[in-house]
Amino acid sequence: MSSPTSTSPKSSFVFSPTSFPHAAIASNNVRPRTNLPPPPPPDRIPPPKGRSHQQKFKILRKEKDKDRRQPIDLEDDWTIEDVTVNGDGVEQESQYLDDLQPEENELKPGPRFLEMANREEKKEKTSKSRGLVKKTSRLFGRDKDKDRGKPEEPAVTGSSSSTLAAMRQSSSTSTDSTTSRSITSAFTRQNSIQSRRSPRTSFGQAHSRRASQDSQMSWPAPRSIRSSTTSHDPSSDPQNSASSTGVPIPQRQGASMSSLSRYSLPHPNGGTSRSPDTFPNKMSTWFSHLLPVSSGSPPSSSYETSSSIRKQSSVAASLFNAARQKAVDGVRHLLDSEAQPDKCMDTIWVRGVAHPGWRPITPENSTSNLPALEPGGSGGGVEDRRASLSMNGPSPNSLRPSSWKRNTSLPPTGQPQSPAHVHTQASNQTTSPSKGFTGIWNPSTLSLGMPIGGSPNKEKENGSGAESPSKKKSKEIVKWPEQFYDDFKSTVWFTYRNQYAPISSLSPNLLIPSPEAYYASFGPPLDATSPSSLRVTTPTAAAQQSASGSGGWGWSKEERGLTSDAGWGCMLRTGQSLLVNALIHIHLGRDWRVPSTPASFSEATTTQEIAALKDYAKYAQMLSWFLDDPSPLCPFSVHRMALIGKELGKEVGEWFGPSTAAGALKTLANSFAPCGVAVATATDSIIYKSDVYTASNLPSDDWNSISPTFNSSKKKRRGDNEAKEEKWGKRAVLILVGVRLGLDGVNPIYYDSIKALFTFPQSVGIAGGRPSSSYYFVGSQANHLFYLDPHLTRPAIPLQIPPLPVHSAKEKGSTESSSIMSTAEEESEEGVMIRTPETPRSTTPSMFSAPEHVEDEDQEEWGQGSKYKLDVVDADGVEVEGIDDDKGRNEGKMIREEVPKSSFESNGAAQEQPKKQKGFTSTASIDSQVDSQVDPHMLWYTTAYPDPLLRTYHCEKIKKMPLSGLDPSMLLGFVCKDEDDFEDFVERVAQLPKKIFTVQDEMPSWEEDDDAGLESVSEPDFEGDEFEEPGTAKPRFDSSSPVNEDSLKGPRVVSASTTATPLAAKEEDHLDVEEANSTDDDNESIGTTTAAGPMDIARHLNRVDLSSKREQEGDDDDGEWVGGTPSSQGVLVEPPSLKGTPSKSRSSAFEPRYEQNGETEQERPVFPARNRMESWVEPVCEGKEAPNGDNLL
């Protein structure tokens, strides 16, 4: 058989003597086989000489033809490089090439040439899937190597890929033609093997690098071992590579590479987009869904800095930024991030006040009003910063899309921005992806609504200045409406605080606000003769004493306690927010807004400025009540709320629920009369009108004993107790309603009702609404709620001890200054300073005085006497003396004269004693218009706390969340000023779409029979420690004598009606009950109401002839509980030998055992009492007792 020729379809070699001088080598190898028969089966032929060997060369030939047809697909020659396959690596290949050179020179075949073919045959057995994985890994490795080797080379836009492909094709064609004329098919096989084993710098490598460079526009690839071919990298130079490998390289290689200089890049155009057929493009499109930009995006962020260290994290930063950009809208609602101004035109309701929604506003045709030039804004500096951080030389403007033109806007002055200004502006802008993870969490990117970088569309939504100047002229600025924003900022916002005094236990007389402790905590009164004393800049000595922990508030520096409520006090803070905004609503009005700059003492000249100054003083005083200090001057501090919650079952440091917070607010507000607001809570989501009216009429007897203003106003209503419950009192009422509107989330049927609550003029917001946390919701718009987040920790503001308030008394019959319920027109008469020295008097602060006529007794009592009604003394040493009506009324002495002198000292100077102050006269007067209308005590509050500190109680960043993210457990707050306001509230509740709570007249009541019967059945147990030792009981009295009150130390007997008693004993028992009621009216009632005395029960038992039975049956029967079964009367019997402190849950019932002889009693052994229920269910023996206590016989 003749040797194969080029015409044979199955031949892998083409031997042409004219083209390849080494053809004799192949002919010598084939000549021994010329006389053989046709080739045997493949399994009988060795691999180097078999059919598979021919198929291998056929595959190489096909690949060569394929390379000629598709030169741009030469990426295969680098996809299996630098990988050890079957033990062959780069070092072995270099040794193999050295051994191959003599064979080429000698032009004769050798064993190594055959071994080479054998190795190639083994390599072909790798699977296609494994090759694809290798190709993918080499793709990333090659591009990463290019980034390190040439950091200063600019990126190539996608529009230039087709041009590069054409250049690669032309270079490949010319190179192939040269190779076909200079090397044989055997050399072609050798080069193909080399391309898979060692790095080569042939045209395939150069073009593959360019192809990978095209893919850099959409993602920065990692670095591999291969370095890019540049003029600055001598190791990758074509000539050096050729000399090192010994492989001839065409001269057109250098020309093709020089044509790809970054200074000769083709201009992009819309018709030359990247071809998706190339392999690198196919690889990049696999990850296109994770990338923030498309083919028309700006240059890659990997070239924005020349640092190769920072580029390593740019891939993860880009992916993170892309995911963040796409999910920012959803994450903003899920995580309750700060809301961005939107274009919702629906009405905004904030605590009963309607504000218009967004309205389009077009700015003037000037760049000075655009967000790009606003300091600290998010627009205008994005492109400038990108230019300053980009590569060394600026890229041509034609390479930048029209939507990404550099912002060349000038400042309003018309002067170009200095580099320092550009750098400062860039530092305030959003960071780029090249910053990596180190720049993601800087202050300018903490907002999830602000992107790290990305497409122009995202920056356009966020107000950046990346558009062309023509688009900037018609751009609309999206911001919150001014009216809504001012109202939102004026809402008081309490957050976590730290660095305050430890929360430790307080004595009972200091835990609940009391007038003695409150007024005793004030500092020395202001001297009316010294206007400079109104300006307080440093804490007084009492304030320092309070801060040091050596005061008399039950805690000291050595005690340990929580000094921060971070993590557990969010419900307390939102509860405080409800109360303080209710106080502002009542005292300052719903239309009050926090001033941008508070009025100064010296600048207030007009009537409006004076009114604003007084309002600001009231505002500062109310905030001081909520400061974090255990002083009695802070009745609503977190200390007292936490300790009250402890009394309600929650330990300090444990998260409070809405019901616990409502209970703490109710206890503190109802005990502090000067606030002018009482709290009424709903029961099982039901508001009872009787509870609301009772709260408005809460007595202030303790405060009346100190304040003559309250005393005079209350005296007129002391005899009108019945009308007191039916008419509205002098206090406003804060109604707190705890509701739960679902299981895991709010039921959507209640959405409209929740939104309607913010339209009530009585609304003060909602506290709670988050799982295991609490927000303060203040408004609604469409299906979203505006809220204040208390989960922000700030340092506590120290308390400044105010001076003792003073007040002047006008002539007899004159009206006093306005009260806590006064309106704006009544406030003008408030706070006249002392000008009549013969009638100085002290009351609560002037804003809390009642507009009532002073009675004659009060004028005589307070018209003459000491300068101050209450001197500054220690709270523990206050003793009030009663004033006799027959004498001493003119002296008006309320405090004992043995007051420590130190309590009157101020700055080292001692005040005069009350007796010496009796004839005190003031000759000084203040001519200022402000001083004549504003109380100096109130002016003290205008300077006591700096405005920056009070600003921490207001939030300027609006947050918004959807209704779907609301937690079903929440606390609703409504404040009613008067009866008309309350009736309007009731009507609005009845019109809610879905009833989430109701209003009823009064709580239903049940008869005592049912209560007593239920008590005796459900709670039959008692504590054994309530008994005293046998033999210590006091003697009983005869049944004919009335019960002595001194002989009873514990709860009295509880008895119900005698419906189950025998008919023969009903009349006598009824008389016994009346007799007991007549004798026990003055006894203290603990637990259930008393209806019968202890001896009455014994007389009743004697009448039914049970005494003889007891003596016969033994002592066990004596201890049985008479009554208490479902079908009998509820009779609870107790011994008089109970301890002085009864059980708090209920009065334990049992009967002592005595043996009576005549008028004296002999003590019998005391045995534990038994429940009467036991005898009824399991009778001990027949014929003993019936369940109602009667004899069964």
Swiss-Prot record:
GO MF term set: cysteine-type endopeptidase activity; protein-phosphatidylethanolamide deconjugating activity
Region (Disordered): 23-284, 358-474, 807-869, 899-924, 1000-1171
Positions with biased composition (Pro residues): 35-49
Organism superkingdom: Eukaryota
Protein name: Cysteine protease ATG4
Record family assignment: Belongs to the peptidase C54 family.
Biased composition (Polar residues): 186-205, 253-262, 270-284, 389-447
Record keywords: Autophagy, Cytoplasm, Hydrolase, Nucleus, Protease, Protein transport, Thiol protease, Transport
Annotated Pfam families: Peptidase_C54
Biased segments, Acidic residues type: 1004-1029, 1070-1084
Subcellular location: Cytoplasm; Nucleus; Preautophagosomal structure
EC number(s) per entry: 3.4.22.-
Originating gene: ATG4
